[in-house]
Amino acid sequence: MIYPKTYDVIVVGGGHAGTEAALAAARMGAQTLLLTHNIETLGQMSCNPSIGGIGKGHLVRELDALGGAMALATDKSGIQFRRLNASKGAAVRATRAQADRILYKAAIREMLENQENLDLFQQAVEDVTLDGERISGVITAMGVEFKARAVVLTAGTFLSGKIHIGLENYEGGRAGDPAAKSLGGRLRELKLPQGRLKTGTPPRIDGRTIDFSQLTEQPGDTPVPVMSVRGNAEMHPRQVSCWITHTNTQTHDIIRSGFDRSPMFTGKIEGVGPRYCPSIEDKINRFADKDSHQIFLEPEGLTTYEYYPNGISTSLPFDIQIALVRSMKGLENAHILRPGYAIEYDYFDPRNLKASLETKTIEGLFFAGQINGTTGYEEAAAQGLLAGANAVQYVRGQDPLLLRREQAYLGVLVDDLITKGVNEPYRMFTSRAEYRLQLREDNADMRLTEDGYKIGLVGEAQWRMFNEKREAVEREIQRLKTTWYTPQKLAEDEQIRVFGQKLSREANLHDLLRRPNLDYAALMTLEGAMPSENLSAEVIEQVEIQVKYQGYIDRQNEEIDSRRDIETLKLPDGIDYGKVKGLSAEVQQKLNQHKPETVGQASRISGVTPAAVALLMVHLKRGFKDAK
C-alpha cells in the first residue's frame, strides 16, 4: 500500500545520525518521518557508553550550538564528566562524559516523541523509490510505500552487516539486531560506489565479579562540567568512578595463541578496521614491543552491574576472550555478560556526496553517519544534523547549510570525506583542523548558533541565551579596554602581588590580561577591577581566551581571508578539465573522478598540486565559455 501522507523528509535509521537528522528536519518545520526497525533502540549506544573527548567533544558542542540533541541528552544521562587537557591550550580542551545507556536512550526518545512535525514508525526499510534520477520515497519490509521529497539514509553498520566471533560469523546489524540485507543490495544496484569497513566491541563484564581493590580509581571532575548550553549540573544523575587495569605479558601470550582462529588474521574479515580504535589483537600484533596496555573499566549505568572494558575490543574466539580478561589484575574471577565481536558492513564512497551530504547521482537522497565511512557516535550525529537540515533546504529550494573548514570541525569532517574519501573508518581529531585555535569547544555557539537560528535549527530560548552571552562578552571586553591603571594609582606591593613586578607605564585591564602570567581571577583582585554585573563562568572563560589569544587569532584570520577566493570559487557543473591549459592528464583524471564543487575542495584532492590550482583559477577568471 501507499501511505496516505506524503512527507517532506524521511529519515531511515534511528541511531545517532538518524535521530539528529529527524529532529533537525522537524525543528525546521518540515513534515518528517523517522523509520526504524525497532523503536525501543532509538538513540542506542551500540558500543562504548561515553560521549565526547578530544575532537569528538568539539563536535558535540557544535551540534549543541546548532540546536542538536546529543549534548543535552548527555547532561541528562551523564554519570561521570571530565575536562580533558584542562592544563593545555584552549584549542585542545575537551569534555568527555560516561553516560548511563538507559537514561541516554530515554532522553533521546523523549525528545523525539515531543518534537512537533515528527512521526515515528517501526519498520525496516528494504527499498528506495525513484522518479527518474530523483528520490521519491521508501518501501518497508511489509510493503508499505512512504512518499517523500527527500530521504536521509543513516543505516549505520546495518547494511549487509556480518558479525564475527572467532571463525564463526552470522548476518546482523549489531548483536541482537538483523542486518539490512535487502536495502544494501538495492543500493548496490543503483551503482553507488561502495566498500566494506569493520568495527568491533569488547566483551562486557559483570561488576560483581571485579575486584576493585586491585584497580586504580578514576573519579570525575569537581565541579562537574556541563555539556550543553541548555543544560546544567542539576540535570546530572548520581556521579560514579571509572577504574583502570592493564594487560600484561600473559594477556598478550593468550591473545597471540588465538591468532590462528582470529577472523582478522585468517582473512574471514574483508573490511578495514579503525586505525585509532584498533582491536586488542591488532594492538598486540602492531605494537609487539609493548608489554602492557591501559584498560579503562567504564560503568554502563546506575541500574546495572555491567562494565565496558575500554581497550579490549576483540573478535577472538570466546574461550580466548575469557582467558585474556581473567589474566588482568582485578579481573581474575570476572564473568563475561556479553562476548566481544567484530562487525563488517557496507559503506558508500563519500566522494560521491556534495558538501550538503546529498548524493551526486540521486537527487534528494542524503547520507549520514557510518554509511559515509566514519566511526563514532559524535561524527555520526553531526553528519545527521547537517543532512537533516540540508534535506529541508533542498525541499524548500533554498541554499544548503555549508560549513567551512575554519568555521567548524563538522566542516572539516565533511570536507575531508568528500575530497579525500576513506580507506578506513574516519575519526575526528583536533589535528585534522588547520585553524583549530578558531575551533574551540568554548566558542562553538559564537561560530554556529546564528547560522542555525537563521534556518530554524535553533529555537527562540537558545537564541536568547546566546545573545545574552555574546553581549555580556562584548560589554566586558569593552570595560577591560576602558579601565586604566597607572603606577601611581597602585601601591608598589599591590603591583608586585598581582603582576609579579612593578608597572612601568599606564595600562588598561585588557592589555594587562594579555600577559601570559596573569589570569582574569587574579586581575579582578585589583581595587576597582571587578565588573558591576555578575558574569557567568562561561562568559569569563570566553573573555579571557579572546583577549589572550587575540594576536594569534588575528593572524589566522588574515590567513583565512587570503584563501577565501580559492575556498569559495565555484567550479561549474560539467566543466571540461581537458580545456584547462597546462593541467596534467593525472590531475584531469582526479578532478573528473572527484567532481569537486569548489576550487578549495579541488585543492585538497590528493595529487592536485598548488600549480594545478593556480591554473584552474586563471581558467575560471578568464571566463571561458565552458566555465561559465
UniProtKB/Swiss-Prot annotation:
Annotated residues for binding of NAD(+): 273-287
Residues that, per the record, bind FAD: G13, G14, G15, H16, A17, G18
Give GO BP annotations, semicolon-separated: tRNA methylation; tRNA wobble uridine modification
Extract the InterPro entries matched here: FAD/NAD-bd_sf, GIDA_C_N, MnmG, MnmG-rel, MnmG-rel_CS, MnmG_C, MnmG_C_subdom, MnmG_C_subdom_sf
In Gene Ontology terms, what is one molecular function of this protein? flavin adenine dinucleotide binding
Entry keyword annotation includes Cell cycle:
no
**Record's keyword terms, sorted:** Cytoplasm, FAD, Flavoprotein, NAD, tRNA processing
The family database entries (PROSITE patterns) matched by this protein are listed as: GIDA_1 (PS01280), GIDA_2 (PS01281)
Q: Which cofactor does it need?
A: FAD
Q: Does the keyword section mention NAD?
A: yes
Stated family: Belongs to the MnmG family.
Q: What does this protein do?
A: NAD-binding protein involved in the addition of a carboxymethylaminomethyl (cmnm) group at the wobble position (U34) of certain tRNAs, forming tRNA-cmnm(5)s(2)U34.
By what name is this protein known? Answer: tRNA uridine 5-carboxymethylaminomethyl modification enzyme MnmG
> Can you name the source organism?
Neisseria meningitidis serogroup A / serotype 4A (strain DSM 15465 / Z2491)
Gene giving rise to this polypeptide: mnmG
